[in-house]
């Protein structure tokens, strides 16, 4: 079964919580609560409702960016973008029990995050995506192949999740580059039935 991370997104049709609930219903076991423009209070309110839903489905829940909140709410971990708290600092604050992921766009990013103690890397974007402002250079299949080859050469063993504008049809070719999983948002939420689409994608 595909290793799938669902990144929450608010649309005209669905709230952040509803988007996560549908992914869980479809069998996704890893939810990243991402509410970029929201206040910590708003994130906390949604996280408190989402945590028991994830627990009931035995799914991992990580927060995008909010390290202090992740510690307070005792979720599974955090994902840190390039402008968020440094991974080393987050590790000091959270200890070893929490999962810490980092965003990477280059092999240099990979080396830094690996040295700082990241548990996994979200590498991307695969292609242009509207869910992210200030997008880093697009990688495409060649970018993943190149970064993963450099990781192998440097003996850097850390799980890699491909992210950024990915649709279901891209998944087989992306997985062939050697990544460990895929992160999706719009590909699921834009489907006529997000629950069924999640199930379908997990079986690709």
From Swiss-Prot:
One of its GO terms (cellular component) is cytoplasm. 4-amino-2-methyl-5-(diphosphooxymethyl)pyrimidine binds at residues 32-36, 64, 103, 132. One of its GO terms (biological process) is thiamine diphosphate biosynthetic process. InterPro entries: Aldolase_TIM, ThiamineP_synth_sf, ThiamineP_synth_TenI, TMP_synthase. Its EC number is 2.5.1.3. Keywords: Magnesium, Metal-binding, Thiamine biosynthesis, Transferase. One of its GO terms (molecular function) is thiamine-phosphate diphosphorylase activity. The keyword Metal-binding applies. Binds 1 Mg(2+) ion per subunit. Mg(2+) binds at residues 65, 84. The keyword Metal-binding applies. Its cofactor is Mg(2+). 2-[(2R,5Z)-2-carboxy-4-methylthiazol-5(2H)-ylidene]ethyl phosphate binds at residues 129-131, 165. Belongs to the thiamine-phosphate synthase family. PANTHER family: THIAMINE-PHOSPHATE PYROPHOSPHORYLASE (PTHR20857), THIAMINE-PHOSPHATE SYNTHASE (PTHR20857:SF15). Condenses 4-methyl-5-(beta-hydroxyethyl)thiazole monophosphate (THZ-P) and 2-methyl-4-amino-5-hydroxymethyl pyrimidine pyrophosphate (HMP-PP) to form thiamine monophosphate (TMP). NCBIfam families: PRK00043.2-3 (NF000736), thiE (TIGR00693). This is Thiamine-phosphate synthase.
């Amino acid at each position: 079964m595909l290793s799938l991370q669902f990144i929450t997104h608010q649309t005209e049709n669905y709230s952040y919580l509803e988007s996560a609930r549908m992914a869980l219903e479809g069998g996704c076991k890893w939810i990243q609560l991402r509410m970029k423009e929201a206040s910590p209070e708003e994130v906390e309110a949604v996280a408190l409702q989402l945590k028991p839903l994830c627990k009931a489905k035995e799914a991992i829940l990580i927060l995008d960016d909010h390290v202090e909140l992740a510690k307070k709410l005792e979720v599974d971990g955090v994902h840190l973008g390039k402008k968020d708290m440094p991974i080393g600092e987050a590790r000091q604050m959270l200890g070893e029990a929490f999962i810490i992921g980092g965003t990477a766009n280059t092999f240099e990013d990979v080396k830094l995050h690996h040295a700082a103690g990241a548990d996994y890397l979200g590498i991307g974007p695969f292609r242009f995506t509207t869910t992210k402002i200030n997008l880093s250079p697009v990688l495409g299949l060649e970018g993943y192949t190149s970064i993963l080859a450099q990781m192998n050469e440097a003996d850097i063993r850390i799980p890699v999740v491909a992210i950024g504008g990915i649709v279901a049809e891209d998944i087989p070719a992306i997985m062939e580059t050697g990544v460990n999983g895929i992160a999706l948002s719009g590909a699921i939420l834009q489907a006529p039935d997000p629950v069924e689409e999640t199930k379908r994608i997990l079986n690709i």
